[in-house]
């Protein structure tokens, strides 16, 4: 069997979409295992950019694309995305949805907006797309699943029950107008009609493929430091984008995972609120943002930029049991002069080589840096590792040494062809 998992090792936006697109050329299945439409991933094919939110990055390849049980789905967003890429010539008949995946409802989106606007509440920087409230209903056993859309009587009962409770909250606590049952029911009845042919039990299908030694690629959204358990809580997402999340989010045994592939940007970025120890503020941070095009694929929000944080990198490598690292955007560092990598934090006089659980302590953390010589050459057209500038290779080798995990692929540009394969994945 060949189960490959691709995860982000930082705070997202590492370039997972591009790498998954490349790897999926040989994949029989590409399986999305968590998250929703709260993150965009970008795939560039022959200079043409595709921005995806719900669909797996492998949708532009021939393998079956699975939206797994651990994903939460806004049917409107799903259908809009299908329509958008079909209009650009892509086929989508190979896209299927797990009948166990949960459905984002209008009251989830409304609740998300309310919670983010409450004055005394910590501002997480949510995308306000209903992801968190949908997962909350899932955990409290009040969720509506894709299988419910195949049984309209059951869907009607669950919607009526949930809407009564949610409208009590909207009207009595927040003084808002109630949401209308008939409007929502008819809207989602229409969605059900359009997507019912895609809703299947994906678990036996994916496991059978693995048992037959087919290549199955598991794709996570967001990244390690946004994980609900191991990220910079509470500035995290509502699911587990780690390798461990694959087993519950796709319905497979951990014994069926052969490779853990961590995607790591050559510097660090973060969107929204939360601690960021290696953040570079001011003109130099703006320069990196400009060169790297560090703006949200969907929201357009500027990303915070900083030096490569290998405290985070080590943490991600260990927890995910990574076998390979894909280093992206190394080309952005060309011409920046001296480069820094963070190897430890100093917090209240104590050296930390691991990410502490106390998020507030990270606000006091002082990064301990190693400084390396940079390079000035344009490396975007280089195809062989040995052709990279000496200092670029030294940078990569030092990162690899600190992580204790091989860098197998280096990305030197946004197009799927701009990769240097050091060792086969």
From Swiss-Prot:
Keywords tagged on the record: Cytoplasm, GTP-binding, Ligase, Magnesium, Metal-binding, Nucleotide-binding, Purine biosynthesis
Record-linked SMART domains: Adenylsucc_synt
Family matches, as Pfam families: Adenylsucc_synt
Binding site for Mg(2+): 13, 40
Keyword Transit peptide: no
GO aspect biological process, one term: IMP metabolic process
Recorded metabolic or biological pathway in which this protein acts: Purine metabolism; AMP biosynthesis via de novo pathway; AMP from IMP: step 1/2
Translocase keyword on record: no
GO molecular function: adenylosuccinate synthase activity; GTP binding; magnesium ion binding
Subunit structure comment from the entry: Homodimer.
Stated family: Belongs to the adenylosuccinate synthetase family.
Reported function: Plays an important role in the de novo pathway of purine nucleotide biosynthesis. Catalyzes the first committed step in the biosynthesis of AMP from IMP.
Protein name, UniProt field: Adenylosuccinate synthetase
Lineage: Bacteria, Fusobacteriati, Fusobacteriota, Fusobacteriia, Fusobacteriales
Gene field: purA
């Amino acid at each position: 069997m060949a189960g490959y998992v691709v995860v982000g090792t930082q705070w997202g936006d590492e370039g997972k979409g591009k790498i998954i697109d490349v790897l999926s050329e040989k994949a029989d299945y590409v399986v999305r295992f968590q998250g929703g439409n709260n993150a965009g991933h970008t795939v560039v094919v022959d200079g043409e950019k595709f921005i995806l939110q719900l669909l797996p990055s492998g949708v532009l390849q021939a393998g079956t694309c699975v939206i797994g049980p651990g994903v939460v789905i806004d049917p409107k967003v799903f259908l809009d995305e299908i329509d958008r890429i079909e209009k650009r010539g892509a086929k989508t008949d190979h896209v299927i949805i797990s009948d166990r995946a949960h459905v984002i409802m209008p009251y989830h989106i409304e609740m998300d907006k309310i919670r983010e606007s409450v004055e005394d509440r910590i501002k997480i920087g949510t995308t306000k797309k209903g992801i968190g409230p949908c997962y909350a209903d899932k955990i409290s056993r009040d969720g509506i699943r894709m299988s419910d859309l195949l049984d309209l009587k059951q869907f009607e009962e669950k919607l009526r029950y949930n809407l009564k409770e949610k409208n009590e909250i909207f009207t009595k606590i927040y003084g808002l107008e109630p949401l209308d049952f008939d409007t929502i029911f008819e809207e989602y009845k229409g969605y059900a009609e359009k997507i019912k042919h895609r809703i299947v039990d994906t678990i036996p299908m994916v496991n059978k493929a693995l048992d037959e030694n087919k290549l199955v690629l598991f794709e996570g959204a967001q990244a390690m430091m946004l994980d609900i358990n191991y990220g910079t809580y509470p500035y995290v997402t509502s699911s587990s984008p780690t390798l461990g999340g694959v087993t519950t989010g796709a319905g497979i045994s951990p014994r069926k995972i052969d490779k853990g592939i961590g995607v790591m940007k050559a510097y660090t970025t973060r969107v929204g609120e939360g601690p960021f120890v290696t953040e570079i503020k001011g003109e130099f941070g703006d320069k990196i943002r400009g060169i790297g095009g560090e703006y949200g694929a969907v929201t357009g929000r500027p990303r915070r930029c900083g030096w490569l944080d290998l405290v985070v990198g080590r943490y991600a490598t260990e927890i995910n049991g990574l076998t390979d690292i894909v280093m992206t955007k190394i080309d952005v560092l060309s011409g920046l002069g001296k480069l820094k990598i963070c190897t430890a934090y100093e917090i209240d006089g104590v050296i930390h080589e691991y990410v502490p659980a106390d998020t507030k302590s990270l606000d006091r953390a002082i990064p301990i840096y190693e400084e390396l010589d940079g390079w000035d050459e344009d490396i975007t057209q280089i195809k062989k590792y040995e052709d990279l500038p000496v200092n670029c290779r030294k940078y990569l080798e030092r990162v690899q040494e600190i992580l204790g995990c091989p860098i197998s692929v280096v990305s030197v540009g946004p197009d799927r062809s701009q990769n240097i394969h050091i060792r086969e994945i």
